[in-house]
Amino acid sequence: MNMPNCLLEMRNITKAFPGVKALNNVNLKVEQGEIHALVGENGAGKSTLMKVLSGVYPHGTYEGDILFEGRVCQFKDIKESEQLGIVIIHQELALVPELSIAENIFLGNEQAKNGVIDWNQTITEAAKLLKKVGLSDSPRTLAMNIGVGKQQLVEIAKALSKKVKLLILDEPTAALNEEDSQNLLHLLLEFKKQGMTSIIISHKLNEISYVADHLTILRDGQSIETLSLQSGEVTEDRIIKGMVGRDLENRFPPREPKIGDVILEVNHWHVDDPLHPDRSLIKDVNLYLKRGEIVGVAGLMGAGRTELAMSIFGKSYGKNIRGQLIKDGKEIKVHSVKDAIDHGLAYVTEDRKTYGLILIDDIKHNISLTSLEKLSKNGVVDKTREVKEAEDFRKKMNIRTPSIDQKTGNLSGGNQQKVVLSKWILSGPDILILDEPTRGIDVGAKYEIYSVIHELAAQGKAVLVISSELPELLGLSDRIYALCEGRITGEVTREEANQEILMKYMTRTGGNGHEVS
């Protein structure tokens, strides 16, 4: 590939961790002023490569060469790479909630004179940077008081304060709603017009096709190919083939639903905000699930989807929760997570790293976490049985790891999600609530998760799926509820459903399905 204005070149980068070679002779070239996408399945090495580039993994811990602006770079830490203008924004945002926007922007790079912070300059400069990223909030606003979309923009403003030449964004839209995602992509295109170079890691191939000039595919720690997207001739299927090493003919596995009787009814469900009890989050929601059925819940960010799920699952979120839960025709009382588990409910959280896993513990202990009583005799865990169950799930769920003694924090996102699912399946539930089950997961791992969901339904379990990706809901669900401002505003069958109808219900403008008042 001819690159007369090559800003970055990474040559033969190899990086190993105990028991695994994460990168194997990877090559990457990025042109000045382009948006370059980096794609690949979870565990392909994308984030590891960017951590090598940015100095998170210092020179000496990897093999190969980094050339930036024609110079060989041997970064000892992230500060050295930032001094040259290479700035990375990680998937997990690093803002301090208790500090203001301005303080976060200049954290570690304070606007000081003679060792004393100049607050007037801090606020003034922060306001200029916020304007550049299109954020109108006051620089004095605490980071905890702005949404995740705005927090992402603050991270970019922070990068701009460091005189960025190469901006690296790792899954920048993974936690954003559609509107915030579009705003961020437009901002990247605006930066490109100004001559800035960006590298974007994303599983959202439609977004990559929209903004990127070139994309490099990684697979199993190796660079497979670099494609030009400027012609518009590279299809998503072509990219997926490069990522997984084969044609993925269908995004969703085939399925013949076998739907049984109603297993769960949620009647007149109300939930108040725990921080503002005078504000209702969920308002008179009614829904039902049948055995063997996959039911979707669609809604924009803030619609109340997660609040609904968590309040049903043992009142684990919300205040003054009221309404009726009926399972198999009988009312059940669920006052705690333990009650929920005892009644056959399971909840896979949208935030696996914070609430779904103990990252510093091994796979075996994470899988057995909700089933210790079941695995115990006289109050003592049967270690042999625990190992057998974990090993069975490792094979059944295709968790890619050399050992169940591996720390869960070392796994890729897709494999972590399989551990969370294994944990809840082992508990033996009749009803599973899956909140964003494939967030931040590549297409290959998504297919495997979809297969697991199909298998659960085939076993007669009811599955409630919450997802921000409408194609996912349309591909998985037998029925879909739409939620808007805490109310169910519509219900559509698989045959009736399409993105347009769902969006109408999600924004309360009606559609052709069954309107719910």
Curated annotation (Swiss-Prot):
Name of the gene this protein is made from: araG
Function as written in the Swiss-Prot or TrEMBL entry: Part of the binding-protein-dependent transport system for L-arabinose. Probably responsible for energy coupling to the transport system.
Catalysed reaction equations from the record: L-arabinose(out) + ATP + H2O = L-arabinose(in) + ADP + phosphate + H(+)
Any single GO CC term annotated in Swiss-Prot or TrEMBL for this entry: plasma membrane
Membrane topology: Peripheral membrane protein
Main location: membrane
GO molecular function per UniProt: ABC-type L-arabinose transporter activity; ATP binding; ATP hydrolysis activity
Keyword Cell membrane: yes
EC numbers, comma separated: 7.5.2.12
Highest rank taxon of the organism: Bacteria
Originating organism: Halalkalibacterium halodurans (strain ATCC BAA-125 / DSM 18197 / FERM 7344 / JCM 9153 / C-125)
Sequence positions that bind ATP 2: A309, M310, S311, I312, F313, G314, K315, S316
The ABC transporter domain, residue ranges: 8-245, 264-510
Subcellular localization, as worded in the UniProt entry: Cell membrane
InterPro entries per record: AAA+_ATPase, ABC_carbohydrate_import_ATPase, ABC_transporter-like_ATP-bd, ABC_transporter-like_CS, L-arabinose_ABC_transporter, P-loop_NTPase
SMART domains according to UniProt: AAA (SM00382)
Keyword set, alphabetical order: ATP-binding, Cell membrane, Membrane, Nucleotide-binding, Repeat, Sugar transport, Translocase, Transport
Name of the protein in question: L-arabinose transport ATP-binding protein AraG
Amino acids binding ATP 1: G40, E41, N42, G43, A44, G45, K46, S47
Record family assignment: Belongs to the ABC transporter superfamily.
Transmembrane segments: none
CDD domains attached to this UniProt entry: ABC_Carb_Monos_I (cd03216), ABC_Carb_Monos_II (cd03215)
